[in-house]
From Swiss-Prot:
Transmembrane segments: none annotated. The keyword Repeat does not apply. One of its GO terms (molecular function) is carbohydrate binding. Induction: Expression is increased following microbial infection by A.apis and P.larvae. Antimicrobial peptide that binds cell wall carbohydrates of microbial symbionts and induces structural damage. Binds the cell wall carbohydrates mannan, N-acetyl-D-glucosamine and lipopolysaccharide. Can target fungi, Gram-negative and Gram-positive bacteria. This is Apidermin 2. Its main location: secreted. The keyword Zinc-finger does not apply. It comes from Apis mellifera (Honeybee).
Amino acid sequence: MKSLLILFAIVAVVAAFPELERERRGVIAAPALAAVPLAPTIALAAPKVAPAIALAPAPKLLAAPAVVAAPGPWKAW
């Protein structure tokens, strides 16, 4: 049910604005970025950020799934 609500919200946002208005607001960012003269600068800056994110250590909670398990008679939601 949540996924249906999210899908409806996305369709409503896309249908609410004409195409040029969506580009101006950034809802469809790819055509708008292609027209901006700074697009090559943005494209070159992205790979510098990506390796830092890839090298970040994973949180400890993700490595221990037993912490998430429900104890005893409790229901796991």
